[in-house]
Amino acid sequence: MSSKATKTVKSKFDIINNQLRDDLIDFRSGDTIRVDVKIKEGDKFRIQSFEGLVIKTQGSGITYSVVVRKMSNGVFVERTFPLHSPIIDSVTLIKRGKVRRSRIYYIRKLSGKAARIKEIMPTKQAKEIK
């Protein structure tokens, strides 16, 4: 009986692992990313970009999601993206930011220059500048 249960569990893991994306880039809180989302309008699909600051990452595996914050027409908008969802077309890293927290909710209270995040330059670019 236990062998049947383990076969069922293994098949569930196989199904989940087949749905995981393998083209995701490595990013964390404080980074600026662009998420391209597929949107269906009628019978057509189009790509909509959402570029902003990562303020939270959570979950693992199929439940991995990220909260991105951007300013749109003077109002800040936060959107949660499940990254292994089929509606996500691509994720692009724009720049790396240096923060000391994994969830940077404090950025919501800051405004102006106080809300800036220090940029980390990749090592290859840093060598080229020097």
Curated annotation (Swiss-Prot):
A GO MF term: structural constituent of ribosome
GO cellular component: cytosolic large ribosomal subunit
One GO process term, biological-process aspect: translation
Pfam families reported for this sequence: Ribosomal_L19
Keyword set, alphabetical order: Ribonucleoprotein, Ribosomal protein
PANTHER family: LARGE RIBOSOMAL SUBUNIT PROTEIN BL19M, RIBOSOMAL PROTEIN L19
Stated family: Belongs to the bacterial ribosomal protein bL19 family.
Functional note: This protein is located at the 30S-50S ribosomal subunit interface and may play a role in the structure and function of the aminoacyl-tRNA binding site.
NCBIfam families for this protein: rplS_bact
Protein name as it appears in the record: Large ribosomal subunit protein bL19
